[in-house]
Swiss-Prot record:
Gene this protein is translated from: pgk
Name assigned to this protein: Phosphoglycerate kinase
Family the entry assigns: Belongs to the phosphoglycerate kinase family.
Residues annotated to bind substrate: 21-23, 36, 59-62, 119, 157
Record lineage: Bacteria, Bacillati, Bacillota, Bacilli, Lactobacillales
Locations listed in the record: Cytoplasm
Annotated GO biological process: gluconeogenesis; glycolytic process
Pfam family, one: PGK
Keywords noted in UniProt: ATP-binding, Cytoplasm, Glycolysis, Kinase, Nucleotide-binding, Transferase
Documented EC number(s): 2.7.2.3
GO cellular component: a single term: cytosol
Organism field: Streptococcus pyogenes serotype M1
Top enzyme category: transferase
HAMAP family found in the cross-reference section: Phosphoglyc_kinase (MF_00145)
Catalytic activity: (2R)-3-phosphoglycerate + ATP = (2R)-3-phospho-glyceroyl phosphate + ADP
Length: 398
């Protein structure tokens, strides 16, 4: 990566501004999944071990008006982080003002402070989300000229707490998590060890058009599963029953198939049910066609076998999107089958592009078998699409 990283700067005695991604799920004030906090620990620990004073920024959820602040404070995150670090985390509970400034100025080397939810600034004219110039300058002024961006999950957004601060400091550098995310995903797409197989699932073709186009150029094979299968089926005149379809994307699907040169591999059968919820019948289709009155909710056993075959010998695999409605045990087999086919390949570099696929790997007990699981759904999608991420572009060149 041609950008400066946290290891390239002297941190001792410095007030170091750090953008982390602590956008964790909360239920009644309790964190239900702390993966993102854990993922940020190496960078935070490095800064404090080097004698820096870490000033952390993160958003949590969406905040548009005063009422939205309810339940969106980072206070539970501060407590969880303190427990993980084994030291106090200063939490002034504000995003600006004398209370924050005094707390920052009182920090000693090796101490950590967490600023309140950056999106609280969105109540006043979306200042965080619209990268308000004054806000970026103000936050930048709280440190000593060094900004560490370790929030891959928001790297595809130009906000005051990433791009805004970057523009107003002497050195904007990547943290370890951001560095790893870029290394794994970008290298997989740009300089993969071959054969390189991409697997794309999920419900909508519209979400993945750019990704499919980019990966058709880069990968040796692109396997398609999930609900978007049926838009590709209908585009070819295959019966899809009541399956999900994007009527306005049929031409796009047809075009992708025509220009794929046989690289695009679709399922050959489905697991169908007579309703999405409250169904009374679940069965495998004979071939591609879905029965009248039924809808496809997972890829079928023949497809699992075909995908297993297509993955044989793969050295690089990027997977984004489940093969079916994996939250329901009746429609998990496709996602499990594909995961198992990926991880059994000898010497494979296997990467999950965040979002639902990451949730599937974690919930179905396969997470530790993958080389890398991305922490950013939208950001990893844009990298897979070949886009430049604003949060990354704003960092200082080496």
């Amino acid at each position: 990566m041609a950008k400066l990283t946290v290891k390239d700067v002297d941190l001792k005695g410095k007030k170091v501004l750090v953008r982390v991604d602590f956008n964790v799920p909360l239920k009644d004030g309790v964190i239900t999944n702390d993966n993102r906090i854990t993922a940020a620990l190496p960078t935070i620990k490095y800064i404090i071990e080097q004698g820096g004073r870490a000033i952390l920024f993160s958003h949590l959820g969406r905040v548009k008006e005063e009422a939205d602040k309810e339940g969106k404070s980072l206070a539970p995150v501060a407590a969880d982080l303190a427990a993980k670090l084994g030291q106090d985390v200063v939490f002034p509970g504000v995003t600006r003002g004398s209370k924050l400034e005094e707390a920052i100025n009182a920090l000693e080397d090796g101490q950590v402070l967490l600023v309140e939810n950056t999106r609280f600034e969105d109540v006043d004219g979306k200042k965080e989300s619209k990268n308000d110039e004054e806000l970026g300058k103000y936050w930048a002024s709280l440190g000593d000229g060094i900004f560490v961006n370790d929030a891959f999950g928001t790297a595809h957004r130009a906000h005051a707490s990433n791009v805004g601060i970057s523009a107003n400091v002497e050195k904007a550098v990547a943290g370890f998590l951001l560095e790893n995310e870029i290394a794994y995903i970008q290298e997989a797409v740009e300089t993969p060890e071959r054969p390189f197989v991409a697997i794309l699932g999920g419900s909508k073709v519209s979400d993945k058009i750019g990704v499919i186009e980019n990966l058709l150029e880069k990968a040796d094979k692109v396997l398609i599963g999930g609900g978007m299968t049926y838009t590709f089926y209908k585009a070819q005149g295959i019966e899809i029953g009541n399956s999900l379809v994007e009527e306005d994307k049929l031409d796009v699907a047809k075009d992708l198939l025509e220009k794929s040169n046989g690289k695009l591999i679709l399922p050959v059968d489905s697991k169908e049910a007579n309703a999405f919820a409250g169904y009374t019948e679940v069965r495998d289709t004979e071939g591609e066609a879905v029965s009248e009155g039924f809808l496809g909710l997972d890829i079928g056993p023949k497809s699992i076998a075909e995908f297993d075959q297509a993955l044989t010998g793969a050295k690089t695999v990027v997977w984004n999107g489940p093969m079916g409605v994996f939250e329901n045990p009746d429609f998990q087999a496709g996602t499990i089958g594909v995961m198992d086919a990926i991880v059994k390949q000898p010497g494979v570099k296997s990467i999950i592009g965040g979002g639902d696929s990451a949730a599937a790997a974690i919930n179905l007990g396969r997470a530790d078998k993958f080389s890398w699981i991305s922490t950013g759904g939208g950001a990893s999608m844009e990298l897979l699409e070949g886009k430049v991420l604003p949060g990354l572009a704003a960092l200082t060149e080496k």
